């Protein structure tokens, strides 16, 4: 293993930026988030040569190193951990006491949406297996669209084959689906996102429910109940449950579940404790990663690039939120932070000659070549990447006696080469056709790299056959990465075109077909929905070499892309929606009511 060099010790002539005041409250955050990137030219001098470069004028991170180091949570205390373990035992007993199929399905749905399902996987598997094996006994869901849809969604989610024909009884040959019950319509809408290619009934279900949910949003009045119906309809239309990362749903659903009259107090208390305990873990991880970032000197020396450490951590938390994946989150966060810097070099700052040399340096993986040929600012970036990848490979070798250095180097090189293709398109003012753009874009969006990193850092033991499958660019990686690419383009293309970047999928489709931007955007959205049907089929394939954990890493990456780019560029520009979610997920614990705190004095007193 090559020795590591500290990039922070290398000199560079890039000027640093003056940081904005630290934002620690929502009001200050909203003011800072209004700044948008614009294009301008800056002149820099390297090796006595002055080079005119583009600059995106990205704003500094909302949360700096000192703020992250100041984080402190009470939920690391052993008292909370003991209470959580006690509650888990009681919930397991309560699960056994639930015997009616619909009640069992609703309990599973609540466990999933509260972020608790991973604690009760054996119990959930047993219930779903039993329901699937006795599906001919369907009186409990007969003429109940809500129950039928819930069963369909949960069984398909967990890999059980269910025919779309279960919905035939809710259709009329002439008018289609018949239902005016909001609960049933919402449940059917969520189920429709688990459809497969060629399922006409499920496609009709999506069209029917989308139309009615939009109407419910428009016709709702100011009554509290109607306002909540409109909110649920809006959330389902924006982002269905199947497209949401677990932790993102949990924070909202805990708040909703607390207001329900039928809530289970054990579940609610456990969900709050679980959320706050995980948040405390995340804060400690952020402190450590922020220290790493500061030590590299990249944020200080490469002032043209984005410091998006907290956003990078949000990605990693969304991909692998469970506590046992701490190392996976660390590797993913650092990788995404480095990807962000390299992306800015290729998209904005580097000259084409420099980019070709950097690509060659990554291909050679030769430190002497890099130090000899790269300009100063690129040496910083290459050394940070080189050191980190080698340390990652060494850790896995030490822990598992598995040499994955070639695999991870190859994955990084694929990304860098895709970046270079887009840089050449930009410099030659070339607009590719949509399919040509997507074939390169599914790599440049980082999908194959992030999936490979997730697997190598989150799997023990690493299975050679599974790794080789991921490296072969299988269809599931292909289509997942294309969805990621398209969602990114929907959220970022306006800002990036304003900067003069390479055309994105929307512009490629407009150029190719003559369509308006509005039509192009609707086409891209429909493409994503159809691609999800392909992904659904691959994840349900019993013969797939992917483990359930690896498949969830992959799905959660796509889900996080939907969140990050739903309201714009949540990663690069730090839009308000992403900032608010980041604040509540990472820095704002859920208050426990006084009665919930009764266990502090005597953990065994609360039932």
Swiss-Prot record:
Entry EC number(s): 4.2.3.20
Transit peptide: first to last position: 1-52
Its subcellular locations are:
Plastid, Chloroplast
- Give the residue interval(s) assigned to the motif DDXXD motif: 343-347
Question: Which parts of the sequence bind Mn(2+) 1?
Answer: 343, 347
Major subcellular location class: plastid
Q: Which residues bind substrate?
A: 343, 347, 485, 488, 504
For activity, the cofactor(s) needed are: Mg(2+); Mn(2+)
Q: How is its activity regulated?
A: Inhibited by 2-fluorogeranyl diphosphate (FGPP) and 2-fluoroneryl diphosphate (FNPP).
Give the cofactor binding note: Binds 3 Mg(2+) or Mn(2+) ions per subunit. The best cofactor is Mn(2+). No effect with monovalent cations.
Residues given in the record as Mn(2+) 2 binding sites: 343, 347
Domain of life, per lineage: Eukaryota
Instruction: Name one cellular component (GO) term.
Output: chloroplast
Which EC class is the enzyme in?
lyase
**Carries keyword Chloroplast?**
yes
Annotated GO molecular function terms are: (R)-limonene synthase activity; magnesium ion binding
The record, for Gene3D superfamilies, names:
Farnesyl Diphosphate Synthase (1.10.600.10), Terpene synthase, N-terminal domain (1.50.10.130)
User: Which keywords does the record carry?
Assistant: Chloroplast, Lyase, Magnesium, Manganese, Metal-binding, Plastid, Transit peptide
Which reaction(s) does its UniProt entry say it catalyses? (2E)-geranyl diphosphate = (4R)-limonene + diphosphate
Domain observations: The Asp-Asp-Xaa-Xaa-Asp/Glu (DDXXD/E) motif is important for the catalytic activity, presumably through binding to Mg(2+).
- Provide the function of this protein: Catalyzes the conversion of geranyl diphosphate to (+)-(4R)-limonene. Produces exclusively the (+)-enantiomer. Can use neryl diphosphate as substrate. Has no activity with farnesyl diphosphate.
Q: Which family does it belong to?
A: Belongs to the terpene synthase family.
Q: What is this protein's name?
A: (R)-limonene synthase 1, chloroplastic
